[in-house]
A protein has these predicted regions:
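Low-complexity segments enriched in small/polar residues
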Residues: 19-187
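Acidic/Ser-Thr/Pro-Gly-rich, low-complexity N-terminal segments
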Residues: 1-23
Length: 187
């Protein structure tokens, strides 16, 4: 006969604890990196509009036979031609770093600051181009008065204001989209 095994009673096995990891909350996405790329596009738009404005105003202020030379000199021989473009880029990058994903109103208010910064950058470049340090105080006062109401300074400020508003609208829309994505990830 074959040996029969004695059935062993089943012992209750201890239940091992199950450890669940909490899901990590979604990272707060920033608008800063992409914002700089959007500002770069805005700067190209500013440079194009600024160039057109310089061409139009220079064509009104100079005789027609001197226009090509004056236009070339406006962007290659003087600081006042290209400093507003750099000032716009720097001002908008600083604005993007500060307001990040804010709404459009923050970019509208910040655009005022950018426009004033571009205006004063042009005035400063204009004074440097005119060698203000070689002037007498009376000549400097006349030079400064002409710099404040220079049509190019006003144009630089106005164009910077408009481009900063529309670039800000683009940045705010992207920031709103990032906020919406974060809300969906939290749910």
């Amino acid at each position: 006969p074959e040996p029969t095994a004695v059935p062993v009673p089943l012992q209750p096995q201890p239940v091992a604890p199950i450890f669940l990891q909490r899901p990590e909350p979604p990272k707060r996405k920033s608008n800063r990196g992409t914002g700089i790329l959007i500002v770069l596009v805005g700067t190209v738009a500013f440079a194009l509009l600024w160039s057109v404005a310089v061409v139009v105003v220079d064509s009104l202020l100079t005789p027609s036979n001197d226009l090509p030379k004056v236009l070339l000199d406006s962007f290659t021989q003087v600081f006042a031609g290209w400093v507003p473009i750099i000032a716009f880029f720097v001002g908008m990058v600083v604005l993007v770093q500060i307001v990040n994903r804010s709404r459009w109103w923050a970019y509208i208010l910040g655009g005022l600051v950018v426009a004033v910064f571009v205006y004063f950058a042009f005035v400063g470049a204009y004074l440097v181009d005119a060698h203000y340090w070689e002037r007498t105080p009376a000549e400097f006062a006349i030079l400064l008065r002409s710099a404040w109401l220079n049509p190019f300074a006003v144009l630089a400020g106005v164009i910077a204001r408009e481009i900063s508003v529309w670039t800000g609208a683009w940045l705010a829309a992207r920031g709103r989209n990032l906020d919406h994505v974060i809300e969906l990830e939290v749910d």
